[in-house]
Amino acid sequence: MSGVKFNIGKIVNTHGIRGEVKVVRITDFEDRFDPGNTVYLQDNKEYKPLVIATHRVHKGFDLLQFKGYGNINEVEAFKGLMLSIDEDQLTDLEEDAYYYHEIVGCKVVTSEGEELGKVKEILSPGANDVWVVQRMNAKDLLIPYIEQVVKQVDIENKIIKVQLMEGMLD
């Protein structure tokens, strides 16, 4: 187990009396919640390993039950806490796909070499992700993650080259 953890969901409530918790998922990989998988409950600075016993989706939420926790009273204290996975549980992505933590913090430059700022967050409003670039002395710039705009992503050097469309800086 490495020391680096990645958040995959937040427990927002309990569900029923048999120890299920309601989770808002913040991962694209539903299989992170497969029964038998280990996730980590972040409580203060401690990470407590929990093994998933059951998983189902109900009204847009992931409902999880953990092995050894069969009663609402045992999971009540989990409300509001984050679920994480270990770095070695990350899976390889296909080409031109990146984990958010790889993109956030990257410097964004135009094809001409003009520095625009750094990616501070990623939005997922619909068909494609939108990278929010924090600029110096200017309002944030929204960069759609599409081929026409994002030309090169260099994760190793944390640099993203873009070709801005007309009106993007307005």
Curated annotation (Swiss-Prot):
Its main location: cytoplasm. GO terms for cellular component: cytoplasm; ribosome. Gene3D superfamilies: PRC-barrel domain, RimM. It is found in: Cytoplasm. Binds ribosomal protein uS19. The PRC barrel domain binds ribosomal protein uS19. This is Ribosome maturation factor RimM. It comes from Oceanobacillus iheyensis (strain DSM 14371 / CIP 107618 / JCM 11309 / KCTC 3954 / HTE831). The lineage of its organism: Bacteria, Bacillati, Bacillota, Bacilli, Bacillales.
